[in-house]
């Protein structure tokens, strides 16, 4: 609360001043409200002068309430005010509502009221009238008083106003139901005053408190007149002191207790409760609502409590505790209060709720929306962040707060109750412009006394910042201000007292900031207060992230260390000055150096400004600088800028001389202009480097000069080229010099486009700077803002050449390009295609051009669309994988010449190697130049690679065993586990080989130093590799070598950092997280002359391209990469141009571990990559197959798990493996030389120890290992040739010493391996069980069960299979593999009975061809070349699986007839195994490495399944229907008889000769089951009566029965049958005989169309039959088959009667297709018209299927041409004359077959459902439908008599019949709707794996890996036993033929020419 400003004598003067300023004040307030209309002004404004009159007004005593009490005017005004209040409050300060007018009106009313009461105020005697008693008030208002005698107990219980009010209010309201709230409050106040005065227990203090409450209540409601001091003579106004107030807090209590002045005491205690609002659910409240009255009531009580607190000191503590609750209530005072002025929603989130109101503006906030957020509301007055920052712009009107109970006292102010600095209370100095308050001693410097006049706080006097701060760089403490001497003591002060202490200031923080839009040259220091005020968020974030007690240490952005910096400062005073001002605060010197000037502009005064790009900063940080700023080399760069403009624009555009400053004459050395016409013939060869290269100071190597000559010649010839020099031979330099030569010799002025990987662009920039100094090179990279700046300023000199903005637009045509070379990344070529594609490029250079190897990539396609005159591609690996990629490179270069990929591959497919190389050279000669280091540097130091085998440490062995044991289940799963889990295990084992600390468990247990790094000695001892590395590095350091250490794992690099710190070596590091600039800096530091760094740590893949570390001569590959190419690229960092020492490469490999095996496999992979030039085979050489993974994991495990004694014995006998792994830079194998030098053991092997296989490295062994003379140069030229050939990735044959021709011609790539399936079982079972016991024991009962990580969880794997296939897993894939696998195991006599014994013997003796081999440049799989593999696949897709006697049928096509039966069957087995192998079709190889060649499992399995079903169905009726479709074609005599008995004995027919034996039902149903399913007995063709159906009928079966009834059934029943069809269309098609001949077929096509649609809808997916749709209950097929038999019976009888030719055919589809309806209509038409053959019906469908069995899938023309199936041509005879006759016929056949295919699949699924005894719950909707069908039938039968009566003319019966028919129609339509939903609700057949309770992998393994199983006959349709007895006696496997995976087949026809 403010201190007193004036005494009572001054009040009249103040009133007079107030009246004089009345008009001015209202204007000001209105102005303030205008600003308030938008909540706050845009710019911060502080108007202390304007506040002054307001403050005077606040200090005056108001007299507006001095009307006579009880007068009507008074009451009406009060009510009016209340109405106004609720209206304004109801709007809640919605943003859409304007308050200005209302608030103005209110203020005008108040002003009028004040004027009206002015005279009374002046004449008042200043005495407060005695308040009226409650009785007087009630009598005056005409209310009934409440007479209640208070007892002693009441005085004890009603201790506060709230309790008293709650007790008495109901009594008053009961007697006066309509009492207004204002009067109720007044009466309650009076009653409380009287009650307190009469209280015998509390005495005078209670009375005083009661008086205060009553006074407060009256103030709120009736406003009793305030006392004003009597008028006195005006006196001269003294000089006003600045405002002060007593704050709250710990510092104020002592003062209050010691104060004698009661008034002051009260003021000190007075607290303004912080205002809260609750933003309502809606933004408007109803006027005078009851809830509003309740809130007003409660807030009035609280107000009363607040006012009473100022008097009652005893209650202050209690009230303080309640303040938080009180603050959350609304306070609605007399008629106007702050609620009307504050918004009803949070300023930040615009939402309502519990909000806190600002006391100095109309804003409101949630506690959590403040920054920083508050946990609870602060005490006292509170200003929002906006007010604290901008100052007060507005003050709320609180009229009632101005009136105090004791008379005229000053109004409560808005200033803070605590000091802003120390947050304590006490006597505070208040600012005149904002709510801030301060202690005098907290100011800096402190003030000795309260200043006179107006005082503004430091925040209000804080100077604004000169701009927007971009970032804070540093902070420091400032010097404190000088001490302030307090004046000399006065004469009345005792002289003995010491002189007063001078007031000392405190140091403040200041911050070094970078300004937005200004360069680092303009960085400056700003005060903390400035930052806090103008950048609050930035300041708070900086505070949160940094230590604000100690300034940060100096950060030398250049990376220089303190020592170097000191030396340089001593030598260079300019550097010293810059260091002191900038560099030490984290600013790099490069950031203050100009890279180039981009543009210029003139200001209004005509002064020039330049846009400057700074070095090492992106383009979006370019800044405009004035002309005369003092920056090094500024003048030179200005000269270069104007010179470049003149050069490019061809005119003198230099800066006018008047703008040049005196004494600053620019150098006038013009840039040399290139010649307009060529001055040198490009075809002329340079013998020495040209003059423009000499001027750069660089010297080209001879081979680089040769490359330049070749490029220039190619350019002259117009031949686009590939420069394919080996890595490290300077392709970049040759390219730059080539472009520079075109420019300097006048051939081309550009522009040139260079596209390179982002990581190498910095290197390109440097090389351009070095080798082409006259080129203007623009690097087009960076974010959108940077690229926008480049486009606007670097692409052209014209301002409007390109539209500005972040969006990319085309450049205007014929605009002068500003640059010579544009350097950009691959990605921006495609992203900013609009601008880059609009420029005509003179030359394109693509670095690392293997990015173009795929012509489908976006980069390839976009770049192809650019306008380019000449193309140059750079690549170190032109044939990285295969010829296809090379072709794409050539196709990109010259699409006119290379445009036929197939022809190109075919041309190089079948020629021998020598011819291939020669032809490749002839072809590539003009286009490609490739040199190797071995070619061009005969004297270049060689590189020698040594594989260093290392032992596992004890800790590593422990973890290695643990990993294998823990993953026992994944390893032991049959089939070898899945690939992902094996890879995970291998990665864990690789980690273990590197270091056990890579596992979190070991890392946690490891000893750690105080600084967080690992203890060095433990770190080294834990890893065998580190122990060796420690010894090696010590010697290498002593000998002066420098080392690169590569590792794949960045965490391993972290451990190596700790190791190097422990050893005390200095090092650098690069991994994937260290990007361009930082990476280059690290390289430069390492390569700097005299650099102290000894080691460079690199991650193998991040340390790849564009890194030159030739200063190192030793490379240690700590762990090998999966892909050997990555390791080669890694060590090429050191073995490159500039290397003058021999490079030693040490590859660490852990002995007898996965690492050793990986190294061997990787070498084989590399050889394979060279071998394979066929497309698709070599592209992912880094990936491992499953067999390889399993093999790698097994390597060394047996030895590891042996007991020590056993290990000693076995190791003593085992010969030590010699080193076969040493390689030199010349290529080739140095095994021989290694043996010569090291004997039979590698270096480090200690031969004296009996345990000879354990490697010990002593000093002698280390010295031997590091000996750099171990080199092999015996056959250098041969090795050169080898490396040259291998660079082309051509095959290198392994020539054996034997003379066998076949062995030389066939290179065996991979042989099938016989693996022990129980390897892991034997090795790990015991350890695994032991570990499980230990775990169980350790975890104990009731403890947490640790989850075992099983990488090969069977349930998870099953789920994957189910997702990929469908829910109803078929047995096909499993059984087929089992059958096919037995080709190799079964005795030949069983499978090949027809072969001669000699042939069998030769086949048996002859070994199978290798799994993968290469013959004459072609890959063979089990001896099958590409053509034979294609022929086999075509046969499968045509006829399905080969039959048992495939060798004697035409299934064996011409291409396959040269194969022996053993080879053929082995390939069938392999093929089926591949089909059963899970995995993506997109993979390039199967698990065993055999190429996929685009095979789609889904399509092949689908085709096999469909063909199997068709064949089975034809064989089912073949013995009845015969072999010929028409009787007249059957030959007479014994041939005909024979054909009736044995069908398909034609050797051209692939169907087996014994159909009854080979093709029973698909699930191998026994005879009994077949009989139950309604199959006819083949032995007794006459016995064709159907079996009796079971009792319960399912819906589809019943529908079938209704439809299949005799033709003489009543029309009503026919109609009913039609309506009951589940998927039938509304209108049945007209019968064919009613249509003209031409319309029959189109009508059928329409029907088929509808059928197709209904099929798609019924199964939900057109490409995959869902089992839900087909699994009906078991009774369905029984009924359906019965109907089929009836139809067959009828049909047979008709045929017997008519042509004595029996025919029988049916498909029991259960009513799920429209087939039977179609047949019914067609047969009716055929029989009635007598055209049995001319109208297509059931008979034609059978012969169509028979033709497909004979001729294959979709061979429509062959089928029609076969005389046996002539019936199929009959319906089309009338259409022969039409032009599209063949097409129409084939289309009909295809669509008809599609329908039959659908029906066959559904029949198969229904049969399976019946076989598995699948039943439905009686409550299932399907069963409910059955009951409803019975209801329909009953209703129809019971009203049949109505039909007869209606026909007889009975009108009442007719009416009833109509009702019955309507009822039937409704029932049927409901049923039809239910039927469509039925398929999704039917039972599911569980997958095979679920039924067997085995995983897919287990089933496959059981079928393939057990040699002792019974043999199984081959053939998809043989009567073989599908499962062996291993599955138990009760298991009944499916019969033969039922093994097709029908669920996963898309049901569409595959009408393709196969």
Curated annotation (Swiss-Prot):
SMART domains: CHROMO (SM00298), DEXDc (SM00487), DUF1086 (SM01146), DUF1087 (SM01147), HELICc (SM00490), PHD (SM00249)
Helicase C-terminal domain mapped to chain residues: 1028-1193
Residue ranges, annotated region (Disordered): 1-134, 225-338, 549-571, 1209-1253, 1351-1411, 1524-1564, 1597-1640, 1658-1696
Compositional bias (Low complexity): 1554-1564
Name this polypeptide is given: Chromodomain-helicase-DNA-binding protein 5
Chain's gene name: CHD5
Record remark on domains: The PHD domains mediate specific binding to histone H3 unmethylated at 'Lys-4' and may preferentially recruit the protein to transcriptionally inactive genes. The chromo domains mediate specific binding to histone H3 trimethylated at 'Lys-27' (H3K27me3) and may be required in neuron differentiation for proper gene regulation.
EC number of this enzyme: 3.6.4.-
């Amino acid at each position: 609360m403010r201190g007193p400003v004036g005494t009572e004598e001054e009040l009249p003067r103040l009133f007079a001043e107030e009246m004089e300023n009345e008009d001015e004040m209202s204007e000001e307030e209105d102005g303030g409200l205008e600003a308030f209309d938008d909540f706050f002004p845009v710019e911060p404004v502080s108007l202390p002068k304007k506040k002054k009159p307001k403050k005077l007004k606040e200090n005056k005593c108001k007299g507006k309430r001095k009307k006579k009490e009880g007068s009507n005017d008074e009451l009406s005004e009060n009510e009016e005010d209340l109405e106004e209040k609720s209206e304004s409050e109801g709007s809640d300060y919605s943003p859409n509502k304007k308050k200005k007018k209302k608030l103005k009106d209110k203020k005008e009313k108040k002003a009028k009221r004040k004027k009206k009461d002015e005279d009374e105020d002046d004449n008042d005697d200043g005495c407060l009238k005695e308040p009226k008693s409650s009785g007087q008030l009630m009598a005056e208002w005409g209310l009934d008083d409440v007479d209640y005698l208070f007892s002693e107990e009441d005085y004890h219980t009603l201790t506060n106003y709230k309790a008293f009010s709650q007790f008495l209010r109901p009594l008053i309201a009961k007697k006066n139901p309509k009492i207004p709230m204002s009067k109720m409050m007044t009466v309650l106040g009076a009653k409380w005053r009287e009650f307190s005065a009469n209280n015998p227990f509390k005495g005078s203090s209670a009375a005083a408190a009661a008086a205060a409450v009553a006074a407060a209540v009256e103030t709120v409601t009736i406003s009793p007149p305030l006392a004003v001091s009597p008028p006195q003579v005006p006196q001269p106004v003294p000089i006003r002191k600045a405002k002060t107030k007593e704050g709250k807090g710990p510092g104020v209590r002592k003062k209050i207790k010691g104060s004698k002045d009661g008034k002051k005491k009260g003021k000190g205690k007075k607290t303004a409760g912080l205002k809260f609002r609750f933003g309502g659910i809606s933004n408007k409240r109803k006027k005078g609502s009851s809830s509003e009255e309740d809130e007003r009531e409660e807030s009035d009580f609280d107000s009363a409590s607040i006012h009473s607190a100022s008097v009652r000191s005893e209650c202050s503590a209690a009230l303080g505790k309640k303040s938080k609750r009180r603050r959350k209530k609304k306070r609605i005072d007399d008629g106007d209060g702050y609620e009307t002025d504050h918004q009803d929603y949070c300023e930040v989130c615009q939402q309502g709720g519990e909000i806190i109101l600002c006391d100095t503006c109309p804003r409101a906030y949630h506690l959590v929306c403040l920054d920083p957020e508050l946990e609870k509301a602060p005490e006292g007055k509170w200003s929002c962040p906006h007010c604290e920052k901008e100052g007060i712009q507005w003050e709320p009107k609180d009229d009632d707060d101005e009136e105090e109970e004791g008379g005229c006292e000053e109004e409560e102010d808005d200033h803070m109750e605590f000091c802003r600095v120390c947050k304590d209370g006490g006597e505070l100095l208040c600012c005149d412009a904002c709510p801030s308050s301060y202690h005098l001693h907290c100011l800096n410097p402190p003030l000795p006394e309260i200043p006179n006049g107006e005082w503004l706080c430091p925040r209000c006097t804080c100077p604004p910042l000169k701009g927007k701060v971009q970032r804070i760089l540093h902070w420091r403490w400032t010097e404190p201000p000088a001490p302030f001497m307090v004046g000399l003591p006065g004469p009345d002060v005792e002289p003995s007292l010491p002189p007063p202490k001078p007031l000392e200031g405190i140091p403040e923080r200041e911050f070094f900031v970078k300004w937005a839009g200004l360069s680092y040259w303009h960085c400056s220091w700003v005060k903390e207060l400035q930052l806090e005020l103008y950048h609050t968020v930035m300041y708070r974030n900086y505070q949160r992230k940094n230590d604000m007690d100690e300034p940060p240490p100096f950060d030398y952005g250049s990376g220089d260390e303190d020592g170097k910096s000191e030396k340089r400062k001593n030598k260079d005073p300019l550097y010293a000055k810059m260091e002191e001002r900038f560099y030490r605060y984290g600013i790099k010197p490069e950031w203050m150096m100009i890279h180039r000037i981009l543009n210029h502009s003139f200001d209004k005064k005509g002064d020039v400004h330049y846009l400057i790009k700074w070095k090492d900063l992106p383009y979006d940080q370019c800044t405009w600088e004035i002309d005369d700023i003092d920056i090094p080399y500024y003048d030179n760069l200005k000269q270069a800028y104007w010179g470049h403009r003149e050069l490019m624009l061809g005119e003198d555009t230099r800066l006018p001389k008047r703008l040049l400053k005196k004494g600053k004459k620019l150098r006038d050395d013009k840039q040399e202009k290139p010649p307009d016409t060529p001055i040198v013939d490009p075809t002329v060869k340079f013998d020495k480097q040209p003059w423009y290269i000499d001027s750069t100071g660089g010297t080209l190597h001879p081979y680089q000069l040769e490359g330049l000559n070749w490029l220039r010649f190619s350019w002259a010839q117009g031949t686009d080229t590939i420069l394919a020099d080996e890595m490290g031979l300077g392709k970049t330099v040759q390219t730059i010099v080539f472009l520079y030569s075109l420019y300097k010799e006048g051939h081309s002025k550009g522009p040139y486009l260079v596209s390179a990987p982002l990581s190498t662009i910095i290197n390109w920039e440097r090389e351009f700077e070095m080798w082409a100094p006259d080129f203007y090179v623009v690097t087009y990279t960076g974010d959108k803002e940077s690229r926008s700046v480049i486009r606007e300023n670097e692409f052209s000199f014209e301002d409007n050449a390109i539209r500005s903005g972040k969006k990319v637009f085309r450049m205007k045509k014929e605009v002068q390009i500003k640059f010579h070379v544009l350097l950009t990344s691959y990605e921006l070529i495609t992203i900013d295609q609009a601008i880059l594609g609009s420029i005509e490029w003179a030359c394109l250079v693509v670095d690392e051009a293997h990015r173009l190897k795929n012509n489908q990539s976006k980069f390839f396609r976009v770049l192809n669309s650019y306008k380019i005159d000449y193309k140059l591609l750079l690549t170190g690996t032109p044939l990285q994988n295969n010829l296809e990629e090379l072709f794409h490179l050539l196709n990109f270069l010259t699409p006119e010449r290379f445009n036929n990929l197939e022809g190109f591959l075919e041309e190089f497919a079948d020629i021998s190697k020598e011819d291939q190389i020669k032809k490749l050279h002839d072809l590539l000669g003009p286009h490609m130049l490739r040199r190797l280091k071995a070619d061009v540097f005969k004297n270049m130091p060689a590189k020698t690679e040594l594989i260093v085998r290392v032992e596992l440490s004890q800790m590593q062995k422990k973890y290695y065993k643990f990993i294998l044991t823990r993953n026992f289940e994944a390893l032991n799963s049959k089939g070898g586990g899945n690939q992902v889990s094996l890879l995970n295990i291998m990665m864990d084992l690789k980690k273990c080989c590197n270091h056990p600390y890579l596992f979190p468990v070991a890392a946690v247990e490891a000893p750690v130093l105080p600084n967080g790094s690992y203890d060095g000695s433990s770190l080294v001892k834990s890893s065998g590799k580190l122990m060796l590395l420690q010894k090696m590095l010590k010697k290498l350091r002593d000998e002066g070598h420098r080392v690169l250490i590569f590792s794949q794992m960045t965490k391993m690099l972290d451990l190596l950092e700790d190791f190097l710190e422990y050893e005390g070596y200095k090092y650098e590091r690069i991994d994937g997280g260290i990007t361009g600039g930082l990476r280059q800096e690290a390289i430069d530091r390492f390569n700097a002359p005299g650099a102290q760094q000894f080691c460079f740590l690199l991650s193998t893949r991040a340390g790849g391209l564009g890194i030159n570390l030739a200063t190192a001569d030793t490379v240690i590959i700590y762990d090998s990469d999966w892909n050997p190419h990555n390791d080669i690229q890694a060590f090429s960092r050191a073995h490159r141009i500039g290397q003058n020492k021999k490079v030693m490469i040490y590859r660490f490999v852990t002995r007898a571990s996965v690492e050793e095996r990986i190294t061997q496999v990787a070498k084989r992979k590399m050889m394979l990559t060279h071998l394979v030039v066929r497309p698709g085979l070599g592209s992912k050489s880094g990936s491992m197959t499953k067999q390889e993974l399993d093999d790698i994991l097994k390597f060394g495990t047996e030895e590891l798990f042996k007991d020590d004694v056993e290990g000693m014995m076995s190791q003593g006998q085992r010969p030590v493996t010699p080193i076969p792994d040493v390689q030199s830079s010349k290529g080739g194998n140095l095994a021989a030389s290694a043996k010569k030098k090291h004997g039979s053991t590698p270096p480090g092997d200690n031969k004296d120890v009996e345990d000879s296989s354990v490697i010990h490295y002593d000093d002698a062994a280390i010295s031997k290992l590091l000996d750099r003379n171990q080199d092999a140069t015996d056959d250098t030229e041969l090795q050169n040739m080898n490396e040259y050939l291998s660079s082309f990735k051509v095959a290198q044959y392994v020539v054996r010493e034997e003379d066998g021709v076949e062995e030389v011609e066939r290179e065996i790539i991979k042989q099938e391996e016989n693996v022990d399936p129980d390897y892991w079982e034997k090795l790990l079972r015991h350890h695994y069980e032991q570990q499980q016991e230990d775990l169980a024991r350790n975890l104990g009962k009731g403890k947490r069960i640790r989850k075992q990580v099983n990488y090969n969880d069977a349930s998870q794997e099953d789920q994957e299979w189910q997702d990929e296939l469908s829910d109803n897993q078929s047995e096909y894939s499993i059984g087929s593999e089992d059958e096919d696998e037995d080709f190799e195991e079964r005795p030949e006599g069983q499978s090949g009975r027809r072969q001669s014994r000699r042939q069998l013997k030769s086949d048996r003796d002859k070994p199978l061809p290798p799994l993968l081999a290469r013959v004459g440049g072609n890959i063979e799989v089990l001896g099958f070349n590409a053509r034979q593999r294609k022929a086999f696949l075509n046969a499968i897709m045509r006829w399905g699986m080969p039959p048992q006697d495939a060798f004697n049928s035409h299934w064996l096509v011409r291409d396959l007839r040269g194969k022996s039966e053993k080879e053929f069957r082995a390939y069938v087995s392999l093929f089926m195994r591949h089909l059963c192998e899970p995995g993506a079709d997109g993979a390039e190889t199967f698990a065993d490495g055999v190429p996929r060649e685009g095979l789609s499992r889904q399509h092949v399995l689908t085709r096999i399944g469909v063909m199997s079903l068709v064949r089975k169905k034809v064989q089912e009726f073949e013995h009845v229907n015969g072999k010929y479709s028409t009787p007249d074609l059957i030959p007479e005599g014994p041939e005909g008889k024979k054909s009736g008995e044995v069908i398909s004995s034609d050797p051209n027919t692939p169907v087996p000769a014994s159909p009854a034996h080979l093709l029973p039902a698909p699930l191998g149903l026994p005879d009994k089951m077949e009989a139950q399913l309604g199959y006819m007995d083949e032995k007794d063709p006459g016995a064709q009566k159907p079996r009796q159906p079971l009792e319960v009928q399912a819906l589809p079966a019943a529908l079938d029965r209704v439809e299949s009834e005799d033709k003489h059934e009543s029309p009503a029943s026919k109609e009913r049958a039609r309506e009951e069809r589940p998927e039938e269309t509304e209108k049945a098609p007209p019968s064919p005989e009613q249509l003209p001949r031409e319309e029959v077929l189109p009508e059928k096509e329409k029907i088929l169309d509808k059928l197709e649609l209904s099929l798609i809808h019924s199964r939900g997916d057109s490409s995959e039959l869902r089992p839900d749709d087909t699994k009906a209950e078991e009774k369905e097929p029984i009924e359906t088959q019965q109907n089929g038999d009836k139809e067959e019976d009828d049909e047979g009888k008709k045929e017997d009667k008519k042509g004595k030719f029996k025919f029988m055919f049916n498909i029991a589809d259960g009513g799920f297709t429209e087939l039977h309806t179609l047949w019914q209509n067609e047969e009716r038409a055929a029989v009635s018209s007598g055209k049995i053959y001319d109208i297509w019906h059931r008979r034609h469908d059978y012969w169509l299927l028979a033709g497909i069995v004979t001729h294959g899938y979709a061979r429509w023309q062959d089928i029609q041409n076969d005389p046996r199936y002539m019936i199929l041509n009959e319906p089309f005879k009338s259409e022969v004359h039409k032009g599209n006759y063949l097409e129409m016929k084939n289309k009909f056949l295809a669509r008809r077959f599609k329908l039959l295919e659908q029906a066959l699949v559904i029949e198969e699924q229904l049969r399976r459902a019946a076989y598995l005894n699948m039943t439905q719950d009686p409550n299932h909707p399907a069963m409910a439908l059955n009951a409803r069908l019975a209801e329909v039938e009953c209703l129809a039968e019971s009203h049949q008599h109505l039909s007869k009566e209606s026909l007889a003319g009975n009108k009442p019966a007719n009416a009833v019949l109509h009702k019955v028919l309507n009822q039937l129609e409704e029932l049927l339509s409901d049923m039809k709707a239910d039927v469509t939903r039925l398929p999704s609700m039917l039972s599911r057949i569980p997958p095979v794996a679920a039924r067997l309770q085995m995983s897919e992998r287990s089933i496959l393994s059981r079928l393939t890996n057990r040699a002792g199983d019974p043999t199984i006959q081959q053939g998809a349709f043989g009567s073989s036993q599908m499962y062996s007895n291993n599955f138990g006696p009760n298991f009944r496997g499916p019969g033969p033929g039922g093994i097709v995976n029908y669920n996963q087949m898309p049901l569409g026809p595959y009408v393709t020419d196969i």
